[in-house]
Amino acid sequence: MQNKIGQNMKDTILEKSKELFLRNGFKTVGMDDIAQALHISKKTIYQYFPSKEDLVKATLYYVYNLAFSKIAEISGKCETAIHEHFKIKESIDGILGKDFETSPCFFQLKKYYPELCYEFEKKRCKDVKNHIENNISEGIKQGIYRENLDKSFLAVQFIAGSDAIDLYEAFPEEIGKRISIKEHDDKFLEFYLRSIVTPKGLEIVENLIKKENEI
């Protein structure tokens, strides 16, 4: 019983930390802010997370596990491998929330917790690469992706392209035209899929984009 109560409190702290960190950033939000939002003492938080870095790490992997449990839930259960991409994108957007669009959280993670960020990125890239390779295999079987695609190469390019919004900072003349994270993700997914689909797959991509635009 005591363990269950303790786990419930830990989960409550992680859920509130997720909300605040993703909205305002890992550096900006302090232990005081989380304690105040939960109406508990900092001492209670420190019982479960001995340091701010411990809480940042736990929250980061809490969000990651939420996202990948959704991916696992969706994978292989959609009408096609293309539908799977769109469904996962929608689900991840729901987990991150609308405030993520303007949040400095991952910029702050890289700047203030570089070792943690490096460790996290290694895991994320490995898991995403495996998922994309599996998706490509399924799409080829379904006749919607071209045969003889280099799955490993494409998976790495998918990860690089998904993260490429950070490169806007390298083009000062484009800063005023910087697109949102959602718009970047939408445009990149379309670009990626158009580069690998068959005519049958292209029809599915265009229909799904049309449906999204009608919402």
Region annotations inferred by a language model:
Residues 105-113, 172-175, 207-211:
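Short linear capping/connector segments at secondary-structure termini
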Residues 1-8, 210-215:
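N-terminal intrinsically disordered/low-complexity leader segments
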Residues 164-169:
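Membrane-embedded alpha-helical segments of multi-pass transporters/permeases
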Residues 12, 16, 20-54, 58:
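Helix-turn-helix
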Residues 60-68:
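Short, basic, alpha-helical segments at the C-terminal edge of helix-turn-helix-like DNA-binding modules
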Residues 58, 72-101, 155-158, 182-185:
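Hydrophobic alpha-helical connector segments
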Residues 97, 101-134, 141-144, 149-153:
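Short secondary-structure transition hinges
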Residues 134-142, 175-215:
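C-terminal peripheral helix-coil segments that are non-catalytic and often amphipathic
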